Every structure is written in C-alpha cells, then in structure tokens.
C-alpha cells in the first residue's frame, strides 16, 4: 500500500504541470523502433562564481516506461560523479506520505456533491474508457483539483514502474548521496491548493473536455511530448508546451490558464533557481545534480537563464 501510495503521489506531484496542458495520458502504439535512451540528454553543466567542481541541471519527463526513463550515458556520468541529488520535491516515502493530506478534501463534502451529477457522469465515463473496472468512488474524499489530474495519470500508474525522478532518487539514496527537494510539496502544489472550488471545477471540466477532444481527433499530445523529449531537443519540447499553452490562453477560461501558468512554471522556475543558487554558494566544493521537469529548462526564461543572470556559466552537454 505504501509503495502504491508513494508512486501515485509522486506522479501527482511531479506531473502537476500536465494539468496546465490538459493532456490525455494515453500513449499511442509505437510502430517504429525506439532508442535505448534519449538521443541527447537534457543536461547542462554549471561552472564559475567560485565553484570548485561543476554541478549539473537535468531535465526529466515524469513517465515510467520507454527510453525516456533510461539516462543518456553523459547524464549517467554526471549523476554518478555528483555527491548530492535534488528532485523537485522530496521523494522519500515518509515525505511523500506526509504530503498526502494536501490531496484530500477538507470541506466535509464528497466530490460528486461538489461537482454535480453531470460532471460526475463525465468523470466516470472517462475513467471507464481508461479501464472498465474504474469509477470515481476512490476520488470522493479527494480535492476537485486532484480529481482533475488523476485521470491523466492513471494509465501510467496502472502500467507500474517508477518515474525517472523516483528512480534517480532511489539510486542516489542507495549510492549514499545527499538527497533533498528543491521545493516542499505544499509550495509546489499551491497553484492548485489556492484555487477556489469553482476554479477547481472548471479545471476538472476543461481537463475532461480536453481528453475527449484529443481522443476524438486521434491526437496524443503526451506522446508528442515524449517523442520530443527523446530527441533531446529543447526547441521541440518547447514547441509542444507552447502550443498547449496557446490553446489554453485562447480558451474560455484565459484568466485561470494564465494564473496556473504563472504558478506552475514561472514562479517555480524562480523558486528552484533561488534554491540552486543558494546551494552552490553554500557548498561550492561539492558536485550537485539538480533534476526537474523538462518544462523548467525550456523557453525564453527558465531555471538555466536565472542561473546565468546570477553570474554562473551554464553550458549544454549533448554527448
């Protein structure tokens, strides 16, 4: 039970940004052969400002299968050489279990009572399409924003396996590296926990609407994102994310979309960059490996650009 809960919470926490894009988590069948690992790693070396050893930034994708969960050899060398490993949030079982209450309702109501019969029926319909045995019964004590995210995660959860972030955390622990989160779960999820119930209901409705639309059109934005990640090209990853953001920004609930974008990406980029800068300043003699979702390293302003602005030299490592 603890292992299942840990995996579910890890997916919920680290895939929170997927709600921003309203992605349907239903990977398409792959006809072509896949590489063993990404063609290029999303890896950057940090130097300068008195650092005695280089440290590294690494972009992950929060899935649990395929070549994306195997480190590129260059990333493996950097990871093995580091003495400290950092994920977005602490991924040890105790920290994950302690964060579970963030996902639970505190208003004394059941989910169906809050969202109404029509939306509840749509949620159940989507769950049945994922697996005929699924329904919303386990969701009734969860927050509405959690119910908006979980349908997108369940296919990965049901496949089993560990997301790359968790695999690296466990490997770091087994290797005796120091481990920590760059954020606390409560801070990472504030984008959702600060939403009003009406906003959470809109998020759920728009998520289900997006899943249905992609299915009807035969699209799979998630697979597009995975494919882009495997190429190791930040521009391709940014293009997929930017398209999803544009679609949301042009939609009916533009203000809500803009608020989520700011909280999930812009604010968190700065928060994690500040943590990295403070860590490097405090421990310049050690090699640190900072892993966060790929979306935090693409675009005009991101974690890496914040470090450059702070005076560090940040260089892409491609092989």
Q: What are the language-model segments listed below?
A:
Residues 26-31:
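Sec/Tat signal peptide C-region and signal peptidase I cleavage site
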Residues 34-35, 42-260:
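Structured, acidic catalytic/metal-binding patches in enzyme active sites
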Residues 39-44, 272-274:
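Alpha-helical scaffolding within the catalytic cores
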Residues 255-319:
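A cross-kingdom marker for long, charged
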């Amino acid at each position: 039970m603890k292992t299942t809960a840990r995996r579910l919470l890890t997916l919920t926490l680290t895939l929170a940004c997927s709600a921003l894009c309203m992605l349907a988590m239903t990977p398409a069948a792959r006809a072509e052969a896949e590489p063993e690992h990404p063609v290029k790693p999303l890896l950057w070396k940090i130097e300068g400002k008195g650092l005695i050893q280089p440290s590294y930034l690494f972009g992950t994708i929060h899935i649990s299968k395929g070549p994306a969960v195997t480190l590129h050899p260059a990333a493996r060398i950097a990871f093995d050489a580091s003495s400290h490993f950092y994920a977005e949030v602490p991924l040890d079982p105790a920290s994950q279990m302690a964060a579970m209450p963030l996902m639970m309702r505190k208003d004394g109501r059941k989910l169906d009572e809050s969202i109404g019969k029509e939306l509840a029926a749509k949620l159940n319909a989507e769950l049945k399409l994922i697996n005929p045995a699924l329904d919303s019964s386990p969701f009734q004590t969860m927050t509405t924003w959690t119910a908006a995210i979980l349908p997108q995660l369940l296919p990965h959860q049901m496949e089993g396996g560990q997301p790359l972030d968790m695999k690296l955390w466990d490997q770091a622990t087994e290797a005796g590296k120091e481990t920590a989160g760059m954020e606390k779960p409560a801070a990472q999820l504030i984008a959702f926990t600060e939403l009003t119930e009406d906003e959470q209901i809109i998020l759920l409705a728009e998520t289900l609407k997006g899943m249905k639309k992609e299915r009807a059109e035969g699209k799979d934005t998630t697979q597009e994102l995975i494919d882009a990640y495997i190429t190791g090209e930040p521009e391709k990853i940014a293009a997929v994310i930017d398209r999803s953001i544009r679609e949301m920004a042009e939609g009916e609930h533009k203000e809500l979309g803009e608020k989520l974008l700011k909280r999930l990406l812009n604010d968190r980029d700065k928060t994690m960059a500040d943590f990295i800068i403070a860590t490097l300043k405090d421990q310049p003699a050690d090699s640190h490996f900072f892993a966060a979702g790929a979306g935090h390293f693409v675009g005009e302003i991101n974690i890496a650009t914040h470090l450059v602005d702070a005076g560090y030299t940040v260089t892409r490592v491609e092989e």
